[in-house]
Curated annotation (Swiss-Prot):
GO MF terms held by the record: cobalamin binding
PANTHER family for the chain: LYSOSOMAL COBALAMIN TRANSPORT ESCORT PROTEIN LMBD1 (PTHR16130:SF2), LYSOSOMAL COBALAMIN TRANSPORTER-RELATED (PTHR16130)
Family: Belongs to the LIMR family. LMBRD1 subfamily.
Name the UniProt record assigns to this protein: Probable lysosomal cobalamin transporter
Topology in the lipid bilayer: Multi-pass membrane protein
Entry keyword set: Cobalamin, Cobalt, Lysosome, Membrane, Transmembrane, Transmembrane helix, Transport
Pfam families: LMBR1
A GO BP entry: protein localization to vacuole
Membrane spanning stretches: 8-28, 46-66, 93-113, 144-164, 189-209, 313-333, 350-370, 376-396, 421-441, 509-529
This protein's GO CC annotations: vacuolar membrane
Annotated localization: Lysosome membrane
Function: Probable lysosomal cobalamin transporter. Required to export cobalamin from lysosomes allowing its conversion to cofactors.
Main location (coarse class): membrane
Length: 584
């Protein structure tokens, strides 16, 4: 029965990972530009995002497996011997170490290599005969050597860096904290490396995720005007008519010869010609966005989008409620940690016992008794925060200080920007792993629905049984003094690993904890600004999109004409020419 239950849990996780790959693929294909699409870049981005989300969404599996060892009456199940529990935690530890190591390698090595490879490949592309060259790979490897060296240094520092030496105090006498102190140098190296990556991710998380958490639901509620709206389309048509009429007036003055115009009128005429070109681009873009000239299915799709626009408003209100619930839960836990942490900054504000109940944590703990109900809620929570991070990156862009370097937009994101956004999402997801487990749902992430029986048994050696005294059932915690808690409660592997980081390297825990208050402040400011700010239509961006679409159309037409002319001249297609070279 226990084996069947564990197998079903892992099967659910495998299905979720498959769904995550679809989510990651959807994100990549929505944002990347079709003109510069690269199979290698697309594959790396999808695989990286899938691995990251799989790491975060392993937590409900962790909680379900360790919680399956206890009964609803606060006792260990008959099959849950110490050996069996150790087998469960060991298998989870192996999976976590594999996923965390994979995330680190992808972030520090694979994605940078792909970035440099695309830069080199973009310059070299193909030789004239259509075969690959080795130059892009060697050039990318040369630049990636710097990241390889940094990775080696990072793990060497983690291998030899001293852990927290201030181990005096009542909190270090607890068995739970003794187990967290790392003595293995290999574990210490991985712990240090991930702790540093989480701190780096916290910085990105505070800036982008806080913005997205507030702006994501508001973007549904207060959508910016669409170019396909009748008012804007009518405005474009009116301005185009005025422009043409003014050009006729100027041309009428000179009898069709612009040289007879004054310099002022010639400048005005040139300006009107440029404006007419821009307005015609906007008109074509507006017609395309309304589905004009497209097939019946596309037109129906646009009509349905207009009909179901009120549902989008309701969806925005629902997302806003989720964001507010997450914000309140984070605030309550942060206050609880700041006030009731057993060791404060000495152990990175580890919370030994939940003193203030937060709503998200309560819902997940209650739902955890009926797996996979908690998994569904947890997936919604993670995807909401992940999507908010994507929206934050798209809103702010990739910047250095106040200078925008690259822009993340639907259908207009270059491969370089997509790879950099993937690195940022990697760091953000590692930070999310800490924030969700330690701040949003601390009790659920540590012990889940596990309880122990605090009923005094007579004789003392008899097993505790609360089947008839449910009022004595208490949630498991690190500070429980009853020996029954130590015999029954099993913390999740994820919480053990994250608490090990903050306990062995308190500086990381201090930064991660206090950054949550900055996150809450930023998100509140962005929410207030978004509520009172009217969305504006970006005409400059629309002109750039229209110009880009026109260039793509011209390039496609030019390429077709060139290929046709070449085939007429040579008498054979390019494929035939390549086969002829191969035969030679």
């Amino acid at each position: 029965m226990a084996l069947l239950h564990s197998t079903l849990i892992w099967i659910v996780y495998a299905i979720v990972v498959g769904i995550l790959s679809i989510v990651a693929s959807t994100f990549v294909y929505i944002y990347q530009t079709p003109r510069d699409r690269s199979a290698a870049v697309t594959t790396v981005c999808i695989f990286t995002l899938t691995a990251l989300l799989a790491t975060v969404l392993l937590l409900p599996v962790d909680v379900a497996l360790v919680s399956s060892t206890t009964s609803e009456f606060g006792r260990r199940k008959d099959w849950a011997t110490d050996h069996e529990v150790e087998k469960i935690t060991y298998s989870l530890t192996v999976v976590y170490y594999f996923l965390y190591s994979l995330d680190a390698v992808l972030c520090l090595l694979i994605v940078p290599f792909t970035y440099f490879w695309y830069e080199e490949y973009d310059e070299v592309a193909y030789e004239d005969d259509g075969r690959f060259t080795r130059k892009p790979f060697w050039g990318a490897f040369k630049y990636t050597l710097v990241f390889i060296l940094l990775t080696i240094i990072l793990f060497l520092v983690g291998f030899f860096v001293p852990v927290a030496k201030d181990r005096k105090g009542a909190h270090f006498d607890l068995d739970y904290f003794k187990r967290l102190l790392t003595e293995n140098h290999g574990e210490r190296a991985l712990t240090f490396a991930l702790g540093l990556l989480i701190v780096m991710g916290i910085i990105v998380y505070v800036i982008y995720s806080s913005t997205g958490l507030a702006f994501f639901p508001i973007s549904f509620i207060k959508s910016s005007p669409s170019i396909s709206s009748p008012m804007l389309s009518a405005n474009i048509e009116s301005r185009l008519e005025e422009n043409i009429e003014r050009q006729r007036q100027l041309e009428g003055r000179c009898g069709g010869n612009p040289d007879h115009l004054s310099s002022k009128d010639r400048r005005e005429l040139d300006s009107l010609v440029r404006e007419e070109r821009t307005l015609r681009r906007r008109k074509r873009l507006a017609e395309a966005s309304r589905g004009q000239g497209r097939n019946f299915v596309i037109k129906v799709w646009y009509k349905l989008g207009a009909v179901f626009r009120p549902i989008k408003l309701l969806g925005g209100l629902l997302l806003l409620a989720i964001s507010v619930m997450i914000w309140i839960s984070m605030l309550l836990t942060c206050i609880d940690k700041a006030k009731n942490s057993v060791c404060k900054q000495k152990c990175g504000y580890i919370l030994g016992k939940i003193n203030i109940i937060n709503p998200v944590n309560w819902v997940l703990v209650e739902a955890a008794s009926v797996f996979p109900a908690d998994y569904v809620i947890f997936i919604v929570l993670v995807l909401h925060l992940f999507t908010s991070s994507v929206v934050g990156i798209a809103t702010i862009g990739i910047r250095f200080l106040w200078i925008r370097l690259l822009q993340i937009r639907k259908g207009h994101t270059s491969p370089q920007a997509l790879l950099l956004a993937t690195v940022m999402l990697t760091l953000i997801t590692l930070a999310l792993n800490y924030s969700i487990s330690m701040i949003v749902v601390p009790q659920y992430a540590t012990y889940g629905p596990q309880t122990f029986c605090d009923y005094p048994s007579i004789p003392a050696s008899a097993p505790l049984d609360c089947s008839k005294h449910k009022e004595y059932l208490k949630p498991c915690s690190e500070l429980a003094n009853n020996p029954a808690a130590k015999a029954v409660c099993t913390p999740s592997v994820a919480s053990t690993f994250l608490n090990r980081i903050t306990l062995n390297f308190p500086f990381f825990g201090i930064v991660d904890f206090w950054a949550q208050f900055v996150f809450l402040g930023f998100s509140l400011i962005v929410l207030l600004i978004s509520l009172f700010r009217t969305p504006r239509f970006d005409e400059q961006q629309m002109d750039e999109d229209a110009e880009e679409a026109e260039e793509e159309g011209l390039l496609a037409a030019s390429g077709s004409r060139f290929n046709a002319a070449w085939q007429d001249t040579t008498g054979r297609t390019r494929d035939q020419r390549v086969r002829f070279r191969d035969d030679e």
